[in-house]
């Protein structure tokens, strides 16, 4: 079969390190009847070992040439192929608690993670290969350089752990950056429940809009010093010093005050 060349516009870098592949499959722990969705199966490096353990495997792929290849594989009868852009994919259209796995294209990773947060209630767990820098931002704790909006928002929905470091030579073509595998497990209200999620999301976005400024300056449209101090936030603090649960508490305090 004609060799498939990675396409930059789809952010394709194909995993080829058998040890890393085995570690990812072991982390996913697929059982025969699990509902598993793989994003971007590519040349089936993870697809094949997953399919061996599953009765059925859903795959989402935008590249038509790869879709054609998938249909010719020996285990193709186990695959449910969804051709199209994963950012437009209806995850709720597949019933059951889902395990989602994938080597995510770096160029769409952040919007895709926010999209997946919206379906967290129907997810058992997720395992993704991502740019290591992104994973470090996702799992970062307050008062660290990597802590920011992405971490706060995803930590609202998930417990997350960096599982596996993946060097560039594990891929073909080799990217210019390091990668890592992250495990994401939905946890309801781990940092408290936002009474108005849209308000909470807006507040967090504003808080981190200018990292060098104080929280007083960044949130002056929404809160004054008394509001901040009411939930234990110093107006002189910067956004990266404030724990996720404090943002939830402030959002709820302001929502109650507005009623």
From Swiss-Prot:
Keywords: Cytoplasm, Methyltransferase, RNA-binding, rRNA processing, S-adenosyl-L-methionine, Transferase. It comes from the Bacteria. SUPFAM superfamilies: S-adenosyl-L-methionine-dependent methyltransferases. GO terms for cellular component: cytosol. The keyword Membrane does not apply. It catalyses: adenosine(1518)/adenosine(1519) in 16S rRNA + 4 S-adenosyl-L-methionine = N(6)-dimethyladenosine(1518)/N(6)-dimethyladenosine(1519) in 16S rRNA + 4 S-adenosyl-L-homocysteine + 4 H(+). S-adenosyl-L-methionine binds at residues 13, 15, 40, 61, 85, 103. Its main location: cytoplasm. Its EC number is 2.1.1.182. Gene3D superfamilies: Ribosomal RNA adenine dimethylase-like, domain 2, Vaccinia Virus protein VP39. SMART domains: rADc. GO terms for molecular function: 16S rRNA (adenine(1518)-N(6)/adenine(1519)-N(6))-dimethyltransferase activity; RNA binding. It is found in: Cytoplasm. Specifically dimethylates two adjacent adenosines (A1518 and A1519) in the loop of a conserved hairpin near the 3'-end of 16S rRNA in the 30S particle. May play a critical role in biogenesis of 30S subunits. PANTHER family: DIMETHYLADENOSINE TRANSFERASE, DIMETHYLADENOSINE TRANSFERASE-RELATED. Belongs to the class I-like SAM-binding methyltransferase superfamily. rRNA adenine N(6)-methyltransferase family. RsmA subfamily. This is Ribosomal RNA small subunit methyltransferase A. It comes from Neisseria gonorrhoeae (strain NCCP11945). The gene is rsmA.
